[in-house]
Amino acid sequence: RGHKLMMSAVKEYALAVNLPVLQPERVKDPAFMEEMKRLSPDLIVVAAFGQFLPKALLDLPPFGCINVHASLLPAYRGAAPIHYAILKGEKKAGVTIMQMDTGMDTGAMLEKVSVPIGPEMTQGELHDELKEKGAALLLQTIDDLSAGTVTAEPQEETKATYASLITRDMEHLDWTLSADTLHNQIRAFNPWPGTYTILPDGKRLKVWKSHVLPGSAEQAQPGQILEADSKGFHIACGTGVLAVLECQPEGKRAMAAQSFVNGQQIAVGEILS
């Protein structure tokens, strides 16, 4: 409700420079395949496309089909590699340009670039950095393919990991987990889909930013509020303590945690679930 369908930046640019735009619901559609044959592309570039290309399309261009994938393959094949890199506490991520085959991100690797993941970096921040790095790497790879200077490197199947679709149940914060794990979850799901906890009154509180504090709270129950003052609030975890820096009550905008504490009178000793 209230959401408007908007064209992508790629389509907007293509229309502006009079490039043909094809948007088949199914890439296996015979009419689409015939049009692709008529266009006779030298190379097909794929990015964030949610369908498998049929072999007939993969074999069509003389330089093949290449995919821009936001992970250091063979790690995190699949739909959500950026989320999972942060969720799993990785210290670096990257972009791989790969030659496509009929599998899911299984093709030979052409070129890679890596970036460090800082301890407070969010999924949105990593996405934006990889977007810039990936675009530059794609242009370089196309030049190298044209010059015949790129060497395809097969992936090691024994090192493959997968980044499956993000589901709604992954948004809930389980305070029995460690502070590090919860901090990674919050970073991984910012800005989408977000994480939440349940307040003592039963309402949801989204948590957007956090920080792992030194020390522990072994005598406290997981989810228990240890401090609530002008600086925000600290929560006991299964291991360690997590400081909430930014949150969002139901029906309101995101705010600094200290603003939430000042307005809600959240009390030390209360339990979040």
Model region roles, listed by residue range:
Residues R1-P191, G240-A243, P249, V261, ...:
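One-carbon transfer enzymes
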Residues T176-S273:
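An anion-binding loop in the catalytic cleft
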